[in-house]
Curated annotation (Swiss-Prot):
It comes from Physcomitrium patens (Spreading-leaved earth moss). Mg(2+) binds at residue 338. 5-aminolevulinate 2 binds at residues 379, 418. Residues 84-113 are annotated as: Disordered. GO terms for cellular component: chloroplast; cytosol. This is Delta-aminolevulinic acid dehydratase, chloroplastic.
Length: 432
């Protein structure tokens, strides 16, 4: 019947009989009188078909129930007079030229559990749903949305209307978690990033606005100095180029408290300074925010896949790179050191970033902690898929859903992805 619905839907104004003929699945169907009621559609009158269509399928007239008792029926079967049933279907024929061979002798044939959609669904080990997505949102001080050239389909959202509209779209398809990233005016940037903890800054204002409109929305925030730093680094830079660790952590604590005070549900230190999780936890608790969670960027690698993100926020380092504080892409075991530290310091969620190039690290964390794992499908991963799809090199929907499924399969509980709304729409459509 799915074929019936698709054929009819693809032929505007068609009669159902035309659709049935077109799809060749009209066996067992008969014309019905033009009576409209639940599940009945006239085959003679043109119609606009709804998304779901129930067409009456009638084979033979249903026989009246037999007056015989259950005991009589059972006795007939025992006596060898079993009632007639449809014959066993003939085995489908192989194409001409197929060699005639004896079946392979093998007790285990894994394909048996894959032979139908129902069996595949029954034994599916990993699932994804909109509840698994966190939508990253870029915000700026302007009133209008501004497209991001390196991230087709993504925009810097005007902090009032654009932000609200995007969250409406997300919630409409079941995505109720967002993370905010600010594009800060250059005039507000400084070497110490003091704007990061301004209670009336862009992020605190966005948090208050969203909580006023959507009290149950889960708001994650980014805790780092790079959007606010005139140097473009995640920490305070000494004159010799060294990123100062402890002084930076002091600033991050004030930033996290300001975000929590505005109403953030989860603060997310992405800076990769040593000891920042424990210091932020202590600062939050002392400020009365014991219920605000920390999502630690535990294994954040110094990756080439961040390029489009830095364009979106204009947060490229003014000199050097971030290799003295972000992890070496060649390292695997080092992620366990960061995991144990963050867990001991009070992290509530552990993150791996990027996601797809580091599926092995996601699995490593999953096997070594009971805490929830998040993974960030970063801007470079997003833009790669979009570019390949635009060039006709792959099917965007299939590639996106497969990539997200692989991240979940590796062990991530939640995924930060720019595809959140689109993927949720696809998933919802599949369940209709």
């Amino acid at each position: 019947m799915v074929g019936v619905m698709m054929a009819a839907a693809a032929t505007p104004g068609c009669g159902v009989s035309q659709a049935l003929t077109a799809c060749g699945s009209h066996e067992g169907l008969r014309r019905v009188a033009p009576v409209f009621g639940p599940g009945v559609v006239s085959v003679s009158a043109p119609c606009k078909l709804p998304r779901k269509l129930n067409v009456q399928a009638v084979a033979e007239p249903i026989a009246k129930s037999s007056p015989r008792t259950i005991e009589e029926c059972e006795a007939n079967v025992v006596a060898g007079n079993a009632p007639a049933a449809p014959p066993v279907p003939a085995k489908p024929s192989a194409p001409e030229g197929t060699p005639a061979i004896s079946p392979l002798v093998m007790p285990a044939r894994p394909r048996r559990n894959r032979r139908s959609p129902a069996l595949r669904a029954a034994f599916q080990e990993t699932t994804i749903s909109p509840a698994n997505f966190i939508l990253p949102l870029f915000v700026h001080e302007g009133e209008q949305n501004a497209p991001i050239g390196a991230m087709p389909g993504c925009q810097r959202l005007g902090w009032r209307h654009g932000l609200i509209d995007e969250v409406y779209k997300a919630r409409d398809v079941g995505v109720n978690s967002v993370v905010l990233f600010p594009k800060v005016p250059d005039a507000l940037k400084s070497s110490t990033g003091d704007e990061a903890y301004n209670p009336d800054g862009l992020v605190p204002r966005c948090i208050r606005l969203l909580k006023d409109k959507f009290p149950d929305l889960v708001i994650y925030t980014d805790v780092a100095l790079d959007p606010y730093s005139s140097d473009g680094h995640d920490g305070i830079v000494r004159e010799d180029g060294l990123i100062m660790n402890d002084e930076t952590v002091h600033q991050l604590c004030k930033q996290a408290v300001a975000q929590a005070q505005a109403g953030a549900d989860v603060v997310s230190p992405s800076d990769m300074m040593d000891g920042r999780v424990g210091a932020i936890r202590k600062a939050l608790d002392l400020a009365g925010h014991q219920d605000v969670s920390i999502m630690a960027y535990t294994a954040k690698y110094a990756s080439a896949f961040y390029g489009p993100f830095r364009e979106a926020l204009d947060s490229n380092p003014r000199f050097g790179d971030k290799k003295t504080y972000q992890m070496n892409p060649a390292n695997y075991r080092e992620a366990l050191i960061e995991t144990r530290m963050d867990e001991a310091e009070g992290a509530d969620i552990l993150m791996v970033k990027p996601a797809m190039p580091y599926l092995d690290v996601i699995r490593l964390l999953r096997d070594n902690t009971a805490l929830p794992i998040s993974a960030y499908q970063v801007s470079g991963e997003y833009s790669m898929i979009r570019a390949a799809a635009a060039a006709g090199m792959l099917d965007e929907k299939k590639a996106v859903l497969e990539s997200l499924l692989s991240i979940r399969r590796a062990g991530a509980d939640v995924i930060l992805t720019y595809f959140a709304i689109q993927a949720a729409q696809w998933l919802c459509a599949e369940r209709v």
